[in-house]
Amino acid sequence: MNRLDQLISTFDLGLRTVFATPHAGRPYPGSPQEAELSETERAHAAALMRVNHVGEVCAQALYAGQALTAKNAQVRSELERAAREETDHLAWCEQRIDELGGRKSLLNPLWFGGAFGIGVVAGLLGDKWNLGFLAETERQVEAHLDGHLQKLPEADAKSRAVVEQMKLDEAQHAQIAIAHGGASLPPPVKWAMRFAADVMRQTASRI
């Protein structure tokens, strides 16, 4: 696939990620039985799942940008494999938001565009930094999901099942990236990533 075809494919991915209904390749983790949740609990859970959905929108864009500029075919293949699992996460989060009567972030086009740009830059820095960025991203997402497991209503088993499976997948992505030669990022870069993620989470929980 030449560079123009890749750009067209990325544009198509952006449209599908932001505006279409994604389809998971794996079964939905949540139990078919819905728990009895108060309106306040449902709204709270929906806001948390909206933040998680934004994270998956960003993951689609980030991996697309990284794959576009990756120099090694094996690295590109690994990024594309991770992106396929993130599509499952995207679909699960959207389904759970719908079940809770919530809505997706209104800023999803902005999130996608920003994350794609970051992914392109990460790829241009070279494969060891590209994979290192992937590993650090997944570590931070894993920690974020662990925090959401503490915040979700105790009775909301369906949301918890989704988040727990996502957490397992993110940890595996980080391990694979390191095994393929991902470098540890400098502390200032890790801090900047956490700061940007905090801004995204605070904004997405409301808008």
From Swiss-Prot:
NCBIfam families per record: DMQ_monoox_COQ7
Reaction(s) catalysed by this chain's protein: a 5-methoxy-2-methyl-3-(all-trans-polyprenyl)benzene-1,4-diol + AH2 + O2 = a 3-demethylubiquinol + A + H2O
Cellular component GO terms held in the UniProt record: plasma membrane
GN (gene name): coq7
Keywords, comma-separated and alphabetical: Cell membrane, Iron, Membrane, Metal-binding, Monooxygenase, Oxidoreductase, Ubiquinone biosynthesis
Cofactor(s) recorded in Swiss-Prot or TrEMBL: Fe cation
Cofactor note: Binds 2 iron ions per subunit.
Species: Thiobacillus denitrificans (strain ATCC 25259 / T1)
Entry annotated with the keyword Membrane: yes
InterPro entries from the UniProt entry: COQ7_proteobact, Ferritin-like, Ferritin-like_SF, Ubq_synth_Coq7
Membrane topology field: Peripheral membrane protein
Family matches, as Pfam families: COQ7
Residues engaged in binding Fe cation 2: E86, E138, E170, H173
Function: Catalyzes the hydroxylation of 2-nonaprenyl-3-methyl-6-methoxy-1,4-benzoquinol during ubiquinone biosynthesis.
Protein name as catalogued: 3-demethoxyubiquinol 3-hydroxylase
Family: Belongs to the COQ7 family.
UniProt binding sites for Fe cation 1: E56, E86, H89, E170
Any one Gene Ontology BP term: ubiquinone biosynthetic process
EC number: 1.14.99.60
A GO term for molecular function: 3-demethoxyubiquinol 3-hydroxylase activity
Pathway it works in: Cofactor biosynthesis; ubiquinone biosynthesis
Record flagged with keyword Membrane: yes
